[in-house]
Regions:
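Short, conserved aromatic-histidine micro-motifs
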Residues: 104-111
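Short alpha-helical "recognition helix" segments of helix-turn-helix
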Residues: 62-69
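Single, function-defining residue in the core of a domain
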Residues: 1-57, 65, 74-75, 79-87, ...
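Short, basic alpha-helical nucleic acid-contact segments in DNA-binding proteins
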Residues: 81-103
């Protein structure tokens, strides 16, 4: 078996990045993850087994062979599966602890506000034809780090209720989050938001409660950008109404044509017809916000929303470098353990790397980043002569490609 991951060689460094106030033994017993040894030396060994299976992509049998060679544990594949299934909630606590540790770091603010992007990514088990798991993520745009995570099954819809919010935050969300009750929740928590909306996402009204004609407003817009005041109702009664700013930005003809072609292509693939209103709305970007206009003019709101792309890049890192989309388990509890172990490895690697690009790779006038070949799994590299190592930055993530066919059990210590 060829496992070229330095994660297996640097256990002490991995453990040093765990939250200092997180008691592994106490929390493992509270979560019933480690009540008796039964072939596993101690709690730390159980975590190492989870990281070998989930973080480094070993199979259950390979993990048992590796652990036996290092005298960490003496288990069969089914026994290891049972232990990992019971440990899934505990591994989730470790993920939460790592994220809480990152949240205590000071973050830069934009005009006194903390910018957070909210999004979710789908994960499928082997052989699945639909979403099996959905990872809901809050992402701090100043630090470039994940600040909150919620894992649900495929039926867990994307909405702002999955995460929590604090005063002084500006939450950035795509059009799927443009729901009246979601926006009310963010405002009740004292935070603000900028969310994209579609022509049929919400029922918009004039501030006085009369019907609002969106397409008449779009056609009447003279410049490239503009705004109008609208009202969004979460239900009957004035107390549930939100008065918001609708920011409108007219796309260039080329951008509008590209979006319209995408809509037509998707409709043809599904065997449906495109609503003419969708083709008309494709010419615009529409944002909803409750931020004050005197402090945040329309151009600033549009500029802030453009930072949202960074969470999409974070998902690409999770899937291409951390291999989060290579879920190998079908049993729900084992799949949870695998995902949490992979997230632990990813978050520790992010702490060590700690770098955020300064601009979007797809921004106008910017060269696109060439994607590296997909790797499984990522490694925390310390090879000074390696292809991904900069002598000034010895803690960078290196990508190691693995043979999928086992060859020999490695002699590594973790």
């Amino acid at each position: 078996m060829v496992i070229r991951s330095d994660l297996l060689n640097i256990w002490e460094q991995v453990r040093a990045h765990l939250p200092p106030d997180f008691d592994l033994e106490r929390t493992a017993r509270e979560r019933c993850a480690f009540l008796r040894k039964r072939g596993v030396k101690d709690v730390a060994s159980l975590l190492r087994l989870a990281l070998a299976y989930g973080g480094c992509g070993m199979s259950l049998r390979e993990t048992c062979a590796w652990a036996g060679a290092l005298k960490l544990a003496s288990l069969s594949g089914p026994s290891l599966m049972e232990r990992l299934c019971k440990a899934a909630p505990w591994l989730g606590d470790i993920v939460a602890g790592l994220i809480s540790q990152q949240a205590t770091l000071p973050t830069k603010r934009w005009a006194g506000y903390r910018l957070r992007a909210i999004d979710a990514t789908a994960i499928c088990q082997p052989g699945a034809d639909r979403t099996t798991w959905r990872l809901h993520v809050g992402f701090d745009l100043a630090s470039g780090q994940v600040d909150q995570i919620a894992l649900t099954d495929g039926r867990g819809a994307e909405n702002l209720q999955r995460l929590t919010y604090r005063p002084g935050e500006i939450v950035l969300g795509d059009r799927i989050y443009a729901r009246a009750h979601n926006l009310q929740l963010v405002k009740r928590d004292g935070a603000d938001f900028i969310v994209r909306t579609g022509w049929n996402s919400l029922r918009l009204k004039h501030p006085n409660g009369s019907d609002f004609d969106l397409f008449a407003t779009l056609r009447a817009q003279a410049g490239q950008e503009g705004e109008v005041r609208v009202r969004v109702d979460d239900g009957p009664g004035e107390s549930t109404a939100l008065e918001l700013r609708l920011i409108i930005w007219r796309k260039t003809p080329e951008q509008a044509e590209t979006e319209q072609k995408r809509l037509l292509k998707n409709a043809k693939k599904r065997g449906t017809k495109v609503d003419p209103r969708s083709l008309e709305a494709a010419k615009y970007v529409m944002l909803l916000t409750a931020l004050p206009a005197d402090a945040f003019p329309a151009c600033d709101v549009l500029a802030i929303y453009r930072f949202r792309w960074q969470i999409e890049l974070a998902f690409k890192r999770m899937k291409s470098l951390a291999g989060l989309d290579e879920l190998a388990a079908k049993e729900p509890a084992l799949a949870q353990a695998w995902l949490y172990a992979r997230l632990i490895a990813f978050l520790i690697a992010e702490q060590i790397a700690g770098q955020v690009p300064e601009s979007s790779p797809s921004a106008p006038g910017k060269a696109r980043i060439k994607q590296k070949p997909r790797a499984k799994p990522f490694a925390l590299a310390h090879d000074k002569n390696g292809p991904h190592c900069n002598p000034r930055h010895h803690s960078r993530i290196a990508v190691a490609r693995h043979s999928r066919r086992p060859e020999a059990i490695p002699s590594v210590s973790m």
